[in-house]
Amino acid sequence: MRYINLLILTLVITVSAIGQQSLKAGAAAPDFNGESLDGKVFNLNQLQGKIVVLTFWSTRCEICHNEIPKLNEVVKRYRDKDVVFLALTMENQVKVEPYLRKNPFSFSILPNSFGVFLKYADMDKGGNINMGFPSYFLINQHGAITLKSDGWDKTSRLDSQIQQMLASE
């Protein structure tokens, strides 16, 4: 019975993944719901009219650890603007909270975001899910992805893109 359940689960994941395309700049950002550590509920569609920055990260990611202070500085620059920063992790609250005590974020953390991760991750022809950490998605006021980037030292590019988007309003 356990084997059959595993087989069914594998088929469901594979079939749902076959239709998934890699998200590119210009594509509509997939909607999602998520709850932050402080209990605030976020829905991407309800953030229409605002610039949204999604950061996918992990407590085990050394690059993430080094990038968060830089990203916190970017967040401070746009605190009074219509820019929403969300940090999404697949890890649960129990895992994330001790990390945050030593490495604070100045924006909302959404734990348990595996479902959102699946919507935003790339999939190769073999059906493997791929996303580097940290990954950044910049979403414009109309819900379209304007920047998709991952890895080391991307915050200056992110900052520049946000400035351009705000200037064109």
Q: Where are the language model's segments positioned?
A:
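Structural microenvironment flanking redox-active thiols in thiol-disulfide oxidoreductases
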Residues: 65-105, 116-124
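Thiol/disulfide oxidoreductase modules built on the thioredoxin-like
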Residues: 102-105, 112-163
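Non-globular targeting/processing and membrane-anchoring segments
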Residues: 29, 165-169
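Short active-site neighborhood of thiol/selenol oxidoreductases, capturing the structured segment around
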Residues: 43-62
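N-terminal "domain-start" segment that seeds a small globular fold
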Residues: 18-44
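Hydrophobic beta-strand anchors of alpha/beta hydrolase catalytic cores
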Residues: 53-54, 85, 136
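Bacterial N-terminal signal peptides
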Residues: 5-15
